């Protein structure tokens, strides 16, 4: 039995149909005999909507209160996905970041994970349940809610995979893998079958937004192999891993933008 961590971004769970699509992907993975931990982002534009709500009240909100507010987005997502999984007959439990054991420093809105306490996740897995975890959030030494910054759910997924020694860490997005440039903006892009951590960081420095930088750095530190996949199209994605002797140089200068 393999342990698989799957992360789904906001576009993958933005509405009812997308939530059930994700639930089917997760349920099929579990029914294949795997233990599954799912990390979920806030739905669609929820985070931006919450930021706008704060701006309606004040133009200078405290970072602590912003974290309290923004954490609500992921909590909605995990509850809805757990409901969908249970509706499909796949027993699931949703956990907030702090219930899942994320402990962070005190840097509100851009916290860093200091340790993972995996007892609760492990307990749920032993009960043969899918564990649905809110990405992007944790708890600091003051027992205050903290968030990890934009793209923090990727980092949450990698941290869980590292702490649990997962067999796979799959990052589901709305694109089919890692390309040499954004296929939505640039002609003649090429999807990469595999790419090294350093090359992924190089692409990110050039503006690629497939993976959060901190998540790639964490994956490199703990040698967590990542697989970038589309939640909308079941085709092979891109593996992000440490360099091996048989890997060719995969990157070349990005093509010119579309007119």
Each model region followed by its residue ranges:
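Conserved catalytic-core segments of large NTP-driven translation/proteostasis enzymes
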Residues: 190, 210, 235-251
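Short, solvent-exposed amphipathic alpha-helical segments in soluble enzyme
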Residues: 54-56, 221, 242-245
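A conserved active-site cap/scaffold subdomain adjacent to cofactor or substrate pockets
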Residues: 217-232
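Conserved small/polar residues in nucleotide/adenosyl-binding loops
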Residues: 252-259
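Nucleotide/pyrophosphate-binding catalytic subdomain
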Residues: 1-217
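Generic structural hydrophobic/aromatic packing signal, biased to beta-strands
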Residues: 94, 200, 226-228, 240
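Terminal amphipathic helices with adjacent charged low-complexity linkers/tails
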Residues: 41, 233-236
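A broadly conserved detector of short glycine/acidic/proline-rich loop/turn motifs that flank catalytic sites
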Residues: 136-137, 175, 230-232, 244
């Amino acid at each position: 039995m393999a342990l698989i961590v799957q992360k789904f971004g906001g576009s993958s769970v933005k509405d009812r149909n997308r939530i059930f699509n994700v639930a089917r992907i997760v349920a099929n993975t579990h029914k294949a005999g795997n233990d599954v931990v799912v990390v979920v982002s806030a739905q669609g534009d929820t985070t931006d909507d919450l930021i706008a709500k704060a701006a309606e009240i004040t133009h200078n909100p405290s970072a602590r209160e912003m974290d309290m507010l923004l954490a609500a987005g992921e909590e909605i997502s995990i509850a809805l996905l757990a409901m969908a999984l249970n509706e499909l007959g796949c027993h699931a439990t949703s956990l907030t970041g702090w219930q899942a054991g994320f402990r962070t420093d005190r840097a509100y809105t851009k916290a860093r994970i200091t340790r993972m306490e995996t007892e609760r996740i492990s307990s749920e897995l032993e009960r043969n349940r899918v564990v649905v975890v809110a990405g992007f959030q944790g708890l600091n030494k003051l027992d205050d809610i903290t968030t990890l910054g934009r793209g923090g759910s990727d980092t949450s997924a990698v941290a869980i995979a590292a702490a649990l020694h997962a067999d796979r860490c799959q990052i589901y997005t709305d694109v089919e893998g890692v390309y040499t440039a954004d296929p939505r903006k640039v002609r003649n892009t090429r999807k990469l079958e595999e790419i090294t951590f350093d090359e992924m960081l190089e692409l990110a420095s050039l503006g690629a937004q497939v993976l959060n930088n901190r998540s790639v750095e964490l994956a490199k530190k703990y040698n967590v192999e990542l697989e970038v996949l589309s939640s909308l199209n079941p085709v092979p994605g891109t593996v992000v891993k440490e360099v091996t002797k048989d890997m060719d140089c995969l990157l070349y200068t990005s093509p010119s933008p579309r007119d």
